[in-house]
Amino acid sequence: MFNPNPKAFPLADRELTIQILDLIELAKAHNQLKKGANETVKTINKGYAELTIIAVDSDPIEIVLHLPLLCEDKNIPYVFINNKHALGHACGISRSVIACCIPAGVNPTLTDQVKNIRNKIEKFIN
Protein backbone atom coordinates (compact mmCIF):
# COMPACT_ATOMS: atom_id res chain seq x y z
CA MET A 1 0.00 0.00 0.00
CA PHE A 2 1.28 3.44 -0.93
CA ASN A 3 1.59 5.88 1.97
CA PRO A 4 2.18 9.38 0.64
CA ASN A 5 4.52 11.72 2.41
CA PRO A 6 2.57 14.06 4.73
CA LYS A 7 4.59 16.99 3.34
CA ALA A 8 2.85 16.49 -0.01
CA PHE A 9 -0.28 18.62 0.27
CA PRO A 10 -2.68 18.93 -1.48
CA LEU A 11 -2.78 15.37 -2.79
CA ALA A 12 -5.32 14.84 -5.57
CA ASP A 13 -7.87 12.08 -5.13
CA ARG A 14 -8.38 9.42 -7.80
CA GLU A 15 -11.06 11.34 -9.74
CA LEU A 16 -9.10 14.60 -9.80
CA THR A 17 -5.92 12.73 -10.79
CA ILE A 18 -7.67 11.22 -13.81
CA GLN A 19 -8.95 14.66 -14.87
CA ILE A 20 -5.49 16.18 -14.44
CA LEU A 21 -3.82 13.43 -16.48
CA ASP A 22 -6.41 13.89 -19.24
CA LEU A 23 -5.71 17.64 -19.24
CA ILE A 24 -1.97 16.99 -19.45
CA GLU A 25 -2.48 14.71 -22.46
CA LEU A 26 -4.54 17.43 -24.18
CA ALA A 27 -1.94 20.08 -23.35
CA LYS A 28 0.77 17.83 -24.77
CA ALA A 29 -1.25 17.37 -27.97
CA HIS A 30 -1.46 21.18 -28.30
CA ASN A 31 2.24 21.66 -27.46
CA GLN A 32 1.31 23.54 -24.27
CA LEU A 33 3.22 21.57 -21.64
CA LYS A 34 6.49 21.99 -19.74
CA LYS A 35 7.90 18.67 -18.52
CA GLY A 36 10.41 18.00 -15.77
CA ALA A 37 11.43 19.79 -12.62
CA ASN A 38 13.88 22.16 -14.33
CA GLU A 39 11.46 23.36 -17.02
CA THR A 40 8.75 23.68 -14.39
CA VAL A 41 10.95 25.84 -12.15
CA LYS A 42 11.91 28.09 -15.08
CA THR A 43 8.27 28.54 -16.09
CA ILE A 44 7.18 29.29 -12.51
CA ASN A 45 10.02 31.79 -11.98
CA LYS A 46 9.09 33.64 -15.16
CA GLY A 47 5.47 33.79 -13.96
CA TYR A 48 4.14 31.91 -16.98
CA ALA A 49 2.78 28.81 -15.22
CA GLU A 50 -0.99 28.40 -15.11
CA LEU A 51 -1.03 25.12 -13.17
CA THR A 52 1.70 22.92 -11.64
CA ILE A 53 1.50 19.16 -11.10
CA ILE A 54 4.01 17.35 -8.87
CA ALA A 55 4.53 13.61 -8.32
CA VAL A 56 4.39 12.60 -4.66
CA ASP A 57 6.42 9.42 -5.21
CA SER A 58 9.53 11.36 -6.23
CA ASP A 59 12.49 9.84 -4.46
CA PRO A 60 13.62 11.64 -2.39
CA ILE A 61 10.56 13.87 -2.02
CA GLU A 62 12.79 16.79 -1.07
CA ILE A 63 13.81 17.30 -4.71
CA VAL A 64 10.34 18.68 -5.46
CA LEU A 65 9.35 20.27 -2.14
CA HIS A 66 10.66 23.66 -3.24
CA LEU A 67 8.06 23.80 -6.04
CA PRO A 68 5.06 24.49 -3.75
CA LEU A 69 6.96 27.41 -2.20
CA LEU A 70 7.68 28.89 -5.62
CA CYS A 71 4.06 28.40 -6.65
CA GLU A 72 2.76 30.08 -3.50
CA ASP A 73 5.05 33.06 -4.08
CA LYS A 74 3.63 33.46 -7.60
CA ASN A 75 0.01 32.55 -6.69
CA ILE A 76 0.04 29.52 -9.00
CA PRO A 77 -2.15 26.56 -8.02
CA TYR A 78 -0.31 23.27 -7.58
CA VAL A 79 -1.28 19.72 -6.73
CA PHE A 80 0.48 16.45 -5.98
CA ILE A 81 -0.52 13.24 -7.74
CA ASN A 82 0.36 9.69 -6.70
CA ASN A 83 2.30 8.31 -9.64
CA LYS A 84 5.32 9.74 -11.44
CA HIS A 85 5.10 6.99 -14.08
CA ALA A 86 1.50 7.93 -14.93
CA LEU A 87 2.59 11.57 -15.10
CA GLY A 88 5.37 10.64 -17.51
CA HIS A 89 2.96 8.63 -19.66
CA ALA A 90 0.50 11.54 -19.78
CA CYS A 91 3.37 13.85 -20.80
CA GLY A 92 4.14 11.54 -23.70
CA ILE A 93 7.43 10.29 -22.28
CA SER A 94 8.43 6.68 -21.71
CA ARG A 95 10.14 7.58 -18.42
CA SER A 96 8.78 8.96 -15.17
CA VAL A 97 8.26 12.70 -14.72
CA ILE A 98 8.35 14.28 -11.27
CA ALA A 99 6.83 17.64 -12.19
CA CYS A 100 5.17 19.44 -15.06
CA CYS A 101 3.22 22.60 -15.64
CA ILE A 102 0.84 24.12 -18.11
CA PRO A 103 2.02 27.59 -19.13
CA ALA A 104 -0.24 30.63 -19.31
CA GLY A 105 -1.67 31.58 -22.67
CA VAL A 106 -2.87 28.08 -23.33
CA ASN A 107 -4.71 27.12 -26.47
CA PRO A 108 -8.30 28.45 -26.32
CA THR A 109 -9.64 24.89 -26.52
CA LEU A 110 -7.94 24.13 -23.17
CA THR A 111 -8.85 27.32 -21.31
CA ASP A 112 -12.11 26.04 -19.81
CA GLN A 113 -10.54 22.76 -18.73
CA VAL A 114 -7.59 24.52 -17.10
CA LYS A 115 -9.95 26.86 -15.21
CA ASN A 116 -12.06 23.89 -14.10
CA ILE A 117 -9.03 22.03 -12.73
CA ARG A 118 -7.71 25.21 -11.07
CA ASN A 119 -11.05 25.71 -9.31
CA LYS A 120 -11.09 22.10 -8.11
CA ILE A 121 -7.55 22.41 -6.76
CA GLU A 122 -8.39 25.65 -4.95
CA LYS A 123 -11.47 23.99 -3.39
CA PHE A 124 -9.29 21.03 -2.46
CA ILE A 125 -6.86 23.30 -0.60
CA ASN A 126 -9.57 25.20 1.28
What residue ranges belong to the model's regions?
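Short basic, glycine-rich beta-strand/loop surfaces that mediate nucleic-acid
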Residues: V64-I125
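Polybasic, low-complexity intrinsically disordered tails and interdomain linkers
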Residues: M1-Y48, A104-N126
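Short, functional N-terminal and low-complexity linear motifs
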Residues: N5-L11, A55, F80-A86
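Extracellular/luminal Protease-associated
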Residues: K35, I44, A49-I63, P68, ...
